[in-house]
């Protein structure tokens, strides 16, 4: 069998009509995750509705509908295997909460696949000032997605078909704005493809014989292997807490950094409650330790369900335990706010699993998004497209960390008027010292 393949997470970004769905499903169709019987069933339905030409996107819509109804076939669907990796496609855009999901999302994407519509008019729409292509690329870069693959899609529909000139024009323009966002375009493969016809997706296409670079599959295989933060102190944000008869209180969450194992003393912040972990399980199997990326249930001693809730963060009591944040300073990019944001603004912050109102206590500086250099001290306000350093104060106890130390607890979405108005990363945190926090009997014995 050899060594098991490494898992990577991919996020697919690009303008709404760029062909993201078709391309994504085509890759999955060819490499993996979909049961052939499911495909046949969908194809038959597509035929009956004369939607054959639309089969891949039709398949994805179908899957989306099943996902929305809560049918759980979806997760295997968005998985595929390359020669080197097991890949999972994270929630692709088009989803209303894409921005929020990408930030508070269950995991950090290791690579962004940017799909560009190469057709006349299509490319221009995607890349225009209000096109989503820029916003998605900026978002990916801000949130620390270091690697990118760019697919020049719909090459079968350029004028003339499979036009080398059109490809070169697009590479030049997209490179210049990816550079503006912060990426190094020389390190990004630009793959001319047809997500619909399948050119250069898995195998080399004779229609594009002027192109000598990697296929999409090759480019995915060339992604640098991600380093998982198991050597850092434990951070495990709680998604939920259950009471299970005969077992007791069972918190559920994803290990973001570090490891958790039976016998460990954990402290839940911001409340400061300390207790011992009795057992850890994933997919109903007991684990001797859980690693970053694992979604686990763990059982804790002498703790009532009411003492725990989603948004709390479990950490190792003896290794840099998490604490309540008094205030923190963040680099914020305003993306979608109709007016001006000034001191005193109080939106909701979605950070890891917590949703808490915070106050923008002080706009410290306005900065250049690309270079990070200061443009203005103590600006009166920030508006769409602006970036700034802001001091924030949570209105309730809250755990956050710096993006540099604990990335999943250091990036956030700012929500207001039911939408994401800004995104940010946390640069520094001033923490409170816990006072008189409760320690369970089991934990007191272990100390």
UniProtKB/Swiss-Prot annotation:
Keyword Ribosomal protein: no
Domain tr-type G: 5-230
GO cellular component: cytoplasm
Positions bearing 5-glutamyl glycerylphosphorylethanolamine: 289, 362
Pfam family, one: GTP_EFTU
Chain positions covered by the region annotation G1: 14-21
Annotated region (G5), positions in chain: 194-196
Main location: cytoplasm
Keyword terms, alphabetized: Cytoplasm, Elongation factor, GTP-binding, Methylation, Nucleotide-binding, Phosphoprotein, Protein biosynthesis
Modified residues (N6-methyllysine): 261
Subcellular location: Cytoplasm
Span list, region G3: 91-94
Residues annotated as binding GTP: 14-21, 91-95, 153-156
Residue ranges of the region described as G4: 153-156
Modification N6,N6,N6-trimethyllysine, positions: 79, 187, 306, 396
Region of interest (G2), residue spans: 70-74
MF terms (GO), sorted A to Z: GTP binding; GTPase activity; translation elongation factor activity
Modified residues (N6,N6-dimethyllysine): 55
InterPro entries according to UniProt: EFTu-like_2 (IPR004161), G_TR_CS (IPR031157), GTP-eEF1A_C (IPR054696), P-loop_NTPase (IPR027417), T_Tr_GTP-bd_dom (IPR000795), TRAFAC_GTPase_members (IPR050100), Transl_B-barrel_sf (IPR009000), Transl_elong_EF1A/Init_IF2_C (IPR009001)
Residues passing through the membrane, by range: none
Function (record text): This protein promotes the GTP-dependent binding of aminoacyl-tRNA to the A-site of ribosomes during protein biosynthesis.
Family note: Belongs to the TRAFAC class translation factor GTPase superfamily. Classic translation factor GTPase family. EF-Tu/EF-1A subfamily.
Protein name (Swiss-Prot/TrEMBL): Elongation factor 1-alpha
Classification of source organism: Eukaryota, Viridiplantae, Streptophyta, Embryophyta, Tracheophyta
